[in-house]
């Protein structure tokens, strides 16, 4: 048997370090066993999926050295490798399950489903969708003939226990009563993740599925689908989730999570990959610094620890420093620095904003310095403003951060629209509102267009600087945060 693993990201945002972490372990497992590593794009969420996000994911993973054998950009014998391009095949599989009695047409309205949830909740049951969902055969035929909208749901046992075999955790038991009748095919004909995932893994010959532990509760549905189809199920391995230093689930609200951020900060890809390799796994000799090839050579999935691995940016900085000092000659250091500092695409985007302000080349460094920095050296007094008190400044920074965290289409125009709407909702003049934003992003209120700066810096660096500025100003306590969250919600922006 040829071992085949896969990573299947959704192109709905910035390339996440969690995606890279899971991709790395899948790659190492496949290579260790002389197998193949596949990349598949799971873009069934057409409303949120973008081509730009897909390209960002591919570029980021390649930057880290995580190369795949088959995928949407390199092709392969099991293509296409985008689920949106495989849409035509999922419907028949769902219909086959209906014919076999393993799934059913569901015509329930959202209101009816809400009522079912409330009834189950009142009975102390799991509020997932189960119970009185199926209609008599004659009624189903009448509804289908009338063209009523429907979804296809899988049938799930009402009682008993589902046993899942996990490569790290052994036998996992989940009560069937906790598993809902999952939608397999949506009313628009698109499959849900669960159907597409199982069908694609089977058709692509995936033998081992290494994924995050957040998918454990979905494993019974997947096991049931494999049984319904009469297919062999891949071996499962649920990896521990990455954590913030405070042990909470890794999130962009507390840590930069985009791979793009670390590239922009000037981290070495080898160091980032090395650090991700230490997330819950260790070399047999416990050394901290190792190459991807060394990790592959020594990889043993049983060395993965189930304790939540902590993604600590300061620890990553330390490791990156070790790589710089121990692995790069002066010439290599200079070449890498030039590659990062004089990135042609970045410079091309930056020049129009500084050329008109410069009289001699030595003017450029002070004007552009903040574009090539990490977190700026800020002090609370930098935010002193004659019209805004400290409380207002902190709210400007926090509200801007929350608003921009929700922005999926990052550009000067979308940023401006968000900022303008916030300033209006807070009843602040644009100039007064922007003062704190200028200082947070550029380190001074006297800089060239901060909207352009944020567009060029990108979402993760922009958010990180706003978060850093808020910390410099003292931030909010947990109690204050709840109050401020209510204020933000009341703005309606």
From Swiss-Prot:
Motif ('KMSKS' region) on chain: 249-253
Main enzyme class: ligase
The entry's keywords: Aminoacyl-tRNA synthetase, ATP-binding, Cytoplasm, Ligase, Nucleotide-binding, Protein biosynthesis
Catalytic reaction annotation: tRNA(Glu) + L-glutamate + ATP = L-glutamyl-tRNA(Glu) + AMP + diphosphate
Domain of life assignment: Bacteria
Cellular compartment(s): Cytoplasm
Xref: Pfam families: Anticodon_2, tRNA-synt_1c
Gene3D superfamilies: 1.10.10.350, HUPs (3.40.50.620)
PANTHER family linked to this entry: GLUTAMATE--TRNA LIGASE, GLUTAMATE--TRNA LIGASE, MITOCHONDRIAL-RELATED
Name assigned to this protein: Glutamate--tRNA ligase
Gene source species: Marinobacter nauticus (strain ATCC 700491 / DSM 11845 / VT8)
């Amino acid at each position: 048997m040829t071992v085949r693993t896969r990573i299947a990201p959704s192109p709905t945002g910035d390339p996440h370090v969690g995606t890279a972490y899971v991709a790395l372990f899948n790659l190492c497992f496949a290579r260790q066993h002389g197998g193949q590593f596949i990349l598949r794009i799971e873009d069934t969420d057409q409303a949120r999926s973008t081509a730009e996000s897909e390209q960002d994911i591919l570029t980021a993973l390649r930057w880290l050295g995580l190369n795949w054998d088959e995928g949407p950009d390199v092709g392969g014998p099991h293509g296409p490798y985008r689920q949106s391009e495989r849409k035509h095949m999922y419907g028949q599989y769902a219909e086959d399950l209906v014919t076999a009695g393993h799934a059913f047409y569901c015509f329930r309205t959202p209101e009816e489903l809400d009522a079912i949830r409330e009834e189950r909740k009142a009975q102390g049951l799991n509020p997932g969708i189960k119970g009185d969902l199926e209609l008599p055969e004659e009624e189903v035929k009448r509804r289908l003939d009338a063209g009523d909208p429907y979804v296809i749901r899988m049938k799930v046992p009402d009682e008993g226990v589902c046993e899942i075999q996990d490569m790290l955790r052994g036998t996992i038991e989940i009560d069937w009563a906790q598993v809902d009748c999952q939608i397999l095919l949506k009313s628009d004909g698109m499959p849900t993740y669960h159907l597409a995932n199982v069908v694609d893994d089977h058709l692509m010959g995936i033998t081992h599925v290494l994924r995050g532990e957040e998918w454990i509760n979905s494993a019974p549905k997947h096991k049931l689908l494999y049984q319904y189809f009469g297919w062999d199920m891949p071996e499962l391995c649920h990896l521990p989730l990455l954590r913030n230093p405070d042990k909470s689930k890794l999130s962009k609200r507390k840590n930069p999570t985009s791979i793009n951020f670390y590239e922009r900060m000037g981290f070495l890809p080898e160091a980032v990959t090395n650090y991700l390799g230490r997330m819950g796994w260790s070399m047999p000799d416990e050394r901290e610094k190792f190459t991807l090839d060394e990790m592959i050579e020594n990889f043993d999935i049983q060395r993965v620890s189930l304790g939540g691995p902590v993604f600590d940016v300061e620890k990553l900085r330390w490791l990156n420093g070790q790589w710089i000092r121990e692995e790069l000659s002066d010439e290599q250091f200079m070449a890498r620095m030039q590659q990062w500092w004089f990135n042609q695409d970045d410079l091309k985007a930056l020049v129009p904003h500084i050329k008109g302000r410069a009289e001699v080349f030595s003017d450029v460094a002070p004007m552009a310095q903040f574009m090539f920095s990490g977190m700026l050296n800020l002090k609370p007094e930098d935010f002193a403003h004659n019209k805004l008190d400290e409380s207002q400044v902190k709210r400007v920074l926090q509200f801007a951060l929350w608003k921009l965290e929700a922005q999926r289409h990052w550009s000067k125009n979308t940023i401006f629209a968000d900022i303008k709407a916030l300033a209006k909702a807070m009843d602040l003049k644009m100039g007064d509102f922007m003062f704190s934003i200028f200082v947070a992003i550029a380190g001074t209120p006297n800089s060239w267009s901060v909207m352009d700066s944020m567009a060029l810096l990108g979402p993760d660096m922009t958010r990180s600087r706003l978060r850093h500025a808020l910390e410099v100003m003292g931030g909010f306590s947990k109690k204050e945060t709840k109050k401020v969250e209510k204020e933000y919600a009341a703005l309606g922006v």
